[in-house]
Amino acid sequence: MRAAYLFLLFLPAGLLAQGQYDLDPLPPFPDHVQYTHYSDQIDNPDYYDYQEVTPRPSEEQFQFQSQQQVQQEVIPAPTPEPGNAELEPTEPGPLDCREEQYPCTRLYSIHRPCKQCLNEVCFYSLRRVYVINKEICVRTVCAHEELLRADLCRDKFSKCGVMASSGLCQSVAASCARSCGSC
C-alpha cells in the first residue's frame, strides 16, 4: 500500500522528467484589457512603492515638519454692549470657540498590479504599495471644553499641577506632556 502511495506521489515528477507534459509558454496577457481600472492609481504621484521610499536627511526632514505646522484660525468673541455689563459671564460659554486646522495625514497600503516577465512569459502580480493621504482637517475647539479637559487632567494627574505651580515642571515634563499635553 505504501508503495502505491509513493508511486502516485512521484508519478507527476517522473512524467515531467520524461517530457510528457507540454510546457509551451502561455500567451502574455494583453496590457490594454487587464487592470484598466487601475490606470489612474498607477500614475498618481501620491502612491509610493515601499522599496522606493528612502529616509530623508535631517535638514530636509526639519523643513518638511515645519511645513506641516498646525494652522489656527481664531474667531473673535462678540463684544458685550456697555449697558449690559452686569450680565457678562465669568466663565467661557459656548460662543468662545475657534476653528483649528491640523494635518490629518494617513498612511495605508493597497495592492497595485505589477507586470512581470520571465522568458517572454508575462503575468501580473499584485504588489503592496503605500498611499499617503494628505489632508487638512478642521475641528472646533471651545474654551469651556479646554477648561474641562484641563480640570480633568489636573485631577487625574495632580503631580503635574503641583510641579508646575512650584516651578519644578522640568522634572516631570515628559510624563505630564504624555498625559496632559504640557506641564
UniProtKB/Swiss-Prot annotation:
Residues 1-17 form the signal peptide. It comes from the Eukaryota. GO terms for biological process: embryonic eye morphogenesis; platelet formation; positive regulation of cold-induced thermogenesis; post-embryonic eye morphogenesis. Pfam families: MAGP. The modification Sulfotyrosine is found at residues 47-48, 50. Disulfide bonds join 153-183, 160-176, 169-180. It is found in: Secreted, Extracellular space, Extracellular matrix. One of its GO terms (molecular function) is fibronectin binding. Residues 153-183 form the ShKT domain. The modification Pyrrolidone carboxylic acid is found at residue 18. Residues 60-74 have a biased composition (Low complexity). Its main location: secreted. Residues 58-94 are annotated as: Disordered. Component of the elastin-associated microfibrils. Belongs to the MFAP family. Forms a ternary complex with BGN and ELN. Interacts with FBN1 (via N-terminal domain) and FBN2. This is Microfibrillar-associated protein 2. It comes from Homo sapiens.
